[in-house]
Structures are given as structure tokens and as C-alpha cells.
Curated annotation (Swiss-Prot):
Organism this protein belongs to: Caulobacter vibrioides (strain ATCC 19089 / CIP 103742 / CB 15) (Caulobacter crescentus)
Name of the protein in question: Anhydro-N-acetylmuramic acid kinase
GO biological process terms on file: 1,6-anhydro-N-acetyl-beta-muramic acid catabolic process; amino sugar metabolic process; peptidoglycan turnover
The entry's keywords: ATP-binding, Carbohydrate metabolism, Kinase, Nucleotide-binding, Transferase
Lineage: Bacteria, Pseudomonadati, Pseudomonadota, Alphaproteobacteria, Caulobacterales
EC number(s) stated in the UniProt entry for this protein: 2.7.1.170
Pathway of action: Amino-sugar metabolism; 1,6-anhydro-N-acetylmuramate degradation; Cell wall biogenesis; peptidoglycan recycling
Binding-site residues, ATP: 9-16
Task of the protein: Catalyzes the specific phosphorylation of 1,6-anhydro-N-acetylmuramic acid (anhMurNAc) with the simultaneous cleavage of the 1,6-anhydro ring, generating MurNAc-6-P. Is required for the utilization of anhMurNAc either imported from the medium or derived from its own cell wall murein, and thus plays a role in cell wall recycling.
Length: 371
């Protein structure tokens, strides 16, 4: 199947797109990949929607703004893809299926008292009509409904990508987005995956709250700052890090209050160290040291994050490109791959990745897939 995958993360930066040819097990070919920045109006709407979603009481009707946001997300994806297809000389008829994550506005992990909640907004019917292609979407809901974490979902793709690269296990893939998550591929092929802690999200939120821009470009502030070890220790003193894996996070799960008194430079440096130390706590839970840590996602473009990871890591740390991976496109590729698995009824969630009782498929498809 030839599939166009889409991903928009909680950083609300861009629509990522990637073309993949796959049967849902092995990868037969990689097509072009790219991104389109979110329009400010869409970003503002989604920020507002996220704030409302976080205050949404359980058991109450969903907020009215969700429907407006669903349409906006569908339109944003369509317009992004139109320019992407034009740039690469492709047409909608080239694809068997679209795999679309949608925009996360709420993610609450399960507790002993209740199941989790997860909301990815997308008007899939609208997008399918606009594109004239079937759309696979809503990949997390079924997982959460049976008590799973709903995240991360990319691990089964990381395993396929590692096979395609000829990488010998054990190996680990780290995605640094708004939240950081890790996939540990054991020597026997078993998967253990979970959110390690914050990625770029806390740094971005800190800078935005101080009116200093949307992100720390090239890690300049963090590289100019000093880590406050007392604040770092306070940040790491969270029950989340002692909780057994698998487990998941929302980018808003940690408070910025501990860094409020620090300069922007020292706050950024301390938050970078927080991201790195949380990753190394993850290694302690794995029980099997990986031969290498492959870093994907936007965080690998931040020299402060990469330098801190490399300095503190017990294993070699390299960006995805060192292994021939497309680090900015891994998540979009993953949802193309997951779309194929959804179409074929193959599992996308596993006990070691989201905590579901048994491997299970997920996602829904609107529109008809050609035989």
C-alpha cells in the first residue's frame, strides 16, 4: 500500500507529512517527506481549544469549540498536503490510504481509579471528501478504552524501521517532541516503550510565558545558562519517574513553577537537563542496556539537548540521520505505517508499549480502500 502519513504534535508547529509503501509489516519504499507550518489562526484556535479541553469535566458534553477545531485541523491538513503533492509531482490518486493522527488537545493517563482520556481532533469525513481518499484516524481511543495509556504508538514502527536499516538489537529510539518518548527494542525483539518526561514542551512554554519567543532557537539560551541542581532535583522528584512502564504524559503534566525564579538562560539549561535526566531514568527501567540511542524529533535540532544527552548518556547518542533515518518525519511515517496495520487488522498497541492486556489493533477508517 502507498500511504501518506500526517502528524501534528503538541508543539503546534507544523503538519508533518511522509510517504511510505508498506504492507503493515515491512517497509518496501520511502517516498518524499516534508512539512508545512501551521497558520497562526489555526494555532491560536488549537491553543484555545487545548485550554478548554484541560478544564473539561468528565461526564460533561464535549466543548462546542471541538467541532470548529476538527474542521480547522482537516482543512489545515488538506492545504498542507495540496502544496506537498504539488511540490513532489504527486496526486491524490497515487495513494491507497491516508494515515492521520489528528491534533491532541487532551491526554490523561489512567489511574487505579479511572481509565484515561485522550482526544485527537480531526474531521476525518471532511478530509476524506476533500482528498477523495480513505482516511485512517483515531488511533488511540480503543487503547485507552481498555485501560491502556494510549501512547506511545510509534514503537512498532521503530522496530520495523530498525529492521529496514539493518540495526542489531538491543537498540533504543528516542523521540523528542513536546513530550519525549523512548522505544527499547530488546535483543529478542520485545518492545518496551513509554514517555520518559518532557521534551521541548516545557522549554517552549517557559519562553512563551516570558514573551521570549516560541522556542529556544539553536539552544542558545540553554547553552548560555547554568543548571540549577536543586531545581533539577525538585523537578525529578516526581512519582511519575518511579511508576512502572509503560506510562504516558501530557506536555502540561509538569509545572514550570520551580524555574520561575531563574533567569531565562538558567531556566532553559535546567529544563534541558530535566529532559536528559528523565531519559536516563528510563534506562534504569529497561533492564537491558541498548547499544545506541537514536534521537528523532525536533529536539535533536537543539544543540543543548543533544550535547546534554551525549554528556550524560551511558550509551552512544546519535541523531536519526546518522542511521539513515529521517528524523523530522519519523512520526508521520509511523502513522502511515499504523494506517496500514489498521487496514489489515494488525496490532498497533502492545502490553509493553501502552499497557493493554494483549496486543490489539486500533484506529478507524472512513472511505473505501481499493482492493
Amino acid at each position: 500500500m502507498k500511504i501518506l502519513g500526517f502528524m501534528t504534535g503538541t508543539s503546534l508547529d507544523a503538519v508533518d507529512m511522509a510517504v511510505l509503501e508498506t504492507d503493515g509489516v515491512e517497509i518496501s519504499a520511502f517516498g518524499p517527506a516534508g512539512e508545512r507550518k501551521l497558520r497562526e489562526a489555526t494555532r491560536d484556535l488549537l491553543l484555545k481549544t487545548t485550554d478548554i479541553a484541560r478544564a473539561w469535566p468528565r461526564g460533561e458534553p464535549e466543548p462546542v469549540i471541538f467541532e470548529e477545531a476538527r474542521r480547522a485541523v482537516a482543512d489545515e491538513h488538506f492545504q498542507a498536503a495540496e502544496s506537498f503533492l504539488d511540490e513532489h509531482g504527486l496526486s491524490w490518486s497515487d495513494f491507497d490510504l491516508l494515515g492521520v493522527h489528528g491534533q491532541t488537545v487532551l491526554h490523561e493517563r489512567p489511574t487505579a481509579q479511572r481509565v484515561g482520556r485522550t482526544v485527537q481532533l480531526l474531521d476525518a469525513d471532511r478530509l476524506a471528501r476533500l482528498c477523495g481518499r480513505p482516511v485512517a484516524f483515531d488511533f488511540r481511543t480503543a487503547d485507552v478504552a481498555v485501560g491502556g495509556e494510549g501512547a506511545p504508538l510509534a514503537p512498532i514502527y521503530h522496530a520495523a524501521r530498525a529492521r529496514a536499516s539493518g540495526l542489531a538489537a538491543p537498540v533504543a529510539a528516542l523521540n523528542v517532541g513536546g513530550v519525549a518518548n523512548i522505544t527499547l527494542i530488546g535483543a529478542n525483539g520485545d518492545l518496551l516503550a513509554f514517555d520518559t518526561g518532557p521534551g521541548n514542551g516545557m522549554i517552549d512554554l517557559m519562553l512563551q510565558a516570558r514573551g521570549l519567543g516560541r522556542f529556544d532557537e539553536d539552544g542558545r539560551l540553554a547553552l548560555a545558562g547554568r543548571v540549577d541542581e536543586a531545581v533539577l532535583a525538585a523537578l525529578l522528584d516526581s512519582p511519575y519517574f518511579d511508576a512502572p512502564a509503560p506510562k504516558s504524559l501530557d506536555r502540561y503534566d509538569f509545572s514550570l513553577t520551580p524555574v520561575d525564579h531563574l533567569s531565562a538562560e538558567d531556566a532553559a539549561a535546567t529544563l534541558v537537563a530535566f529532559t536528559a535526566e528523565a531519559v536516563f531514568k528510563a534506562f534504569a527501567q529497561s533492564g537491558e542496556a541498548p547499544s545506541a540511542l537514536i534521537v528523532c524529533g525536533g529536539g535533536r535540532h537543539n544543540p543543548a539537548i543533544m550535547q546534554t544527552l551525549a554528556a550524560r548518556a551511558p550509551v552512544p547518542v546519535k541523531s536519526a540521520e546518522a542511521y539513515g533515518w529521517r528524523g523530522d518525519s519519523i512520526e508521520a511515517e509511523a502513522f502511515a505505517y499504523l494506517a496500514a496495520r489498521t487496514a489489515k487488522g494488525l496490532p498497533i498497541s502492545f502490553p509493553g508499549t501502552t499497557g493493554v492486556p494483549a496486543p490489539m489493533t486500533g484506529g478507524r477508517i472512513v472511505g473505501l480502500i481499493s482492493a
